[in-house]
């Protein structure tokens, strides 16, 4: 199955638009795992097992693994998700952006080394920097558009021909880049008006939406702005609020409770 097919199936099977971000901060791991060998993998595995029936995707953030020399644990984690919870797509949050020859190796890293189902990329260097990822027809390519951080406005709101740059990215994705139907866009929950504008531009293209939970994005406004006609179309990401719901031995159960509450809150507004 392609990434988009897996995602659509997960939306329906788990009745969920929730994506759980896997950002394992060694300073916030449960006390029972502190200092243990393979602690990052063990922590993420417990979170995955506790939430897999509640999500439409998992999103490991590559920097949290690389900074701890835990690339092997990231490989192990993605393999584990695919083996233990087949049908749940894994988005490698790498935000890569470089010239074509280097991008070829980043694509190899994401799709052949880590076996991710999708990867996040930056459009700043243009379409040729994204082509190596699109050469993998079964994988997803999720392009930064209107990010959730306040500083994103420094560039994304620059006016070009009377339009903010983020809108031009959305238009390019719809009109020129997404020829194989593999693309999605990143649009932050902290900017619901922009979510609605991007949805208007790109139709049913999937949106990865960070920024709820610890970043303060409003779930009701996010869902109403970004949902498609059938009440899907989004991967609404929450990381810290779920991962670090507890530092005690009940951390996985606590994470599940927060994930369940978040999914149910999202679902309250999907069709209303």
From Swiss-Prot:
User: Catalytic positions?
Assistant: 95 (proton donor)
Which GO terms fall under biological process for this protein? Answer: 'de novo' pyrimidine nucleobase biosynthetic process; 'de novo' UMP biosynthetic process
Supply the InterPro entries for this chain.
Aldolase_TIM, OMPdecase_AS, OMPdecase_type-2, OMPdeCOase_dom, RibuloseP-bd_barrel
What Enzyme Commission number(s) apply to this enzyme? 4.1.1.23
Enumerate the UniProt keywords alphabetically.
Decarboxylase, Lyase, Pyrimidine biosynthesis
Any idea which GO molecular function terms this record carries? orotidine-5'-phosphate decarboxylase activity
What the entry lists under SMART domains is as follows: OMPdecase (SM00934)
Pathways per UniProt: Pyrimidine metabolism; UMP biosynthesis via de novo pathway; UMP from orotate: step 2/2
Catalytically driven reaction(s): orotidine 5'-phosphate + H(+) = UMP + CO2
Name the family: Belongs to the OMP decarboxylase family. Type 2 subfamily.
Q: Which HAMAP family match?
A: OMPdecase_type2 (MF_01215)
Name of this chain's protein: Orotidine 5'-phosphate decarboxylase
Source organism: Cupriavidus taiwanensis (strain DSM 17343 / BCRC 17206 / CCUG 44338 / CIP 107171 / LMG 19424 / R1) (Ralstonia taiwanensis (strain LMG 19424))
């Amino acid at each position: 199955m392609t990434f988009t097919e897996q995602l659509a199936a997960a939306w329906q099977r788990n009745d969920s638009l929730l994506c759980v971000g896997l950002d394992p901060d060694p300073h916030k791991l449960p006390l029972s795992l502190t200092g243990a060998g393979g602690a990052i993998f063990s922590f993420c595995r417990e979170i995955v097992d506790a939430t897999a029936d509640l999500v439409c995707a998992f999103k490991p953030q590559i920097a949290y693994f690389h900074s701890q020399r835990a690339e092997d644990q990231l490989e192990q984690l993605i393999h584990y998700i695919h083996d233990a919870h087949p049908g749940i797509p894994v988005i490698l949050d790498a935000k890569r952006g470089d010239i074509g020859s280097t991008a070829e190796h980043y694509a190899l890293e994401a799709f052949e080394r880590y076996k991710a189902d999708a990867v996040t990329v930056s459009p700043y260097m243009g379409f040729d920097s994204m082509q190596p990822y699109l050469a993998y027809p079964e994988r997803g390519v999720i392009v930064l558009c209107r990010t959730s951080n306040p500083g994103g406005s420094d560039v994304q709101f620059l006016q070009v021909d009377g339009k903010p740059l983020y809108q031009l990215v959305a238009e390019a994705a719809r009109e020129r880049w997404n020829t194989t139907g593999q693309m999605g866009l990143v649009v932050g929950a902290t900017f619901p008006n922009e979510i609605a504008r991007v949805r208007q531009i790109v139709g049913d293209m999937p949106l990865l939406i960070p920024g709820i939970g610890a970043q303060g994005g409003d779930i009701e406004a996010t869902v109403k702005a970004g949902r498609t006609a059938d009440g899907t179309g989004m991967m609404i990401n929450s990381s810290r609020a779920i991962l670090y719901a507890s530092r005690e031995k009940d951390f996985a159960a606590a994470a599940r409770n927060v994930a369940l509450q978040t999914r149910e809150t999202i679902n309250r507004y999907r069709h209303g």
